[in-house]
């Protein structure tokens, strides 16, 4: 995680330098991506909401600073509704379909015996594919809930807000608005579980790949000709495999932390706790902002 943060700091300074010298710099890649713009809007909106919550608790709702922060938060919320609509159908929809296909493929593979490697126990094969199927199922739940929120409910509420004569009754509007919180709570919970399953699956898969390399199953691909060369190439390949796997695990850990913070925010938003509404709003906004920053940094590091 420290290495990712270190690379992020170096990458940020380089990105701002290249902003004026290279058209295809990292900042341009982030901004040109619907997902990147969505994360930028989410971070800015969360910062405005936290500011408004703190000002409301300390100074009240009548100050100019609170009114400004509230308007900024609402404006960024509307902007994110528009941005996320494109992200929902351009990125989330195909990813959800792919997760569903992968889930069913792993479920089918878990029921079939391993033909090429009879030494592998059937139980191990079932566990491996079952773990991946569960992770894909969590990704599918996350995709469906995201599509429901940002591909259907939020756009409907936004259009209803723009019309001179809204087509939704107050009761329907409040019901849809309340449902968003619970749907996204399911999204965040599924993402936490899915990230944990991905970490477990990645560790197991990495161990399996390293064992295959040690057993010589990849010698033809690696191109080793003698025993000493084989051993050297195997060790380098194992080191590279572990390094790549560790990077994927780090990103999964960051995703888990991000979504866990959003789960904490959901807890303070949706569950009646024995603390004042102002403190609940501040804690929820702080957790959401922290999660948004982690998500933006992770996306930046991958871009």
Model regions and ranges:
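Glycine-rich, hydrophobic membrane-spanning regions of integral membrane proteins that mediate transport
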Residues: 1-303
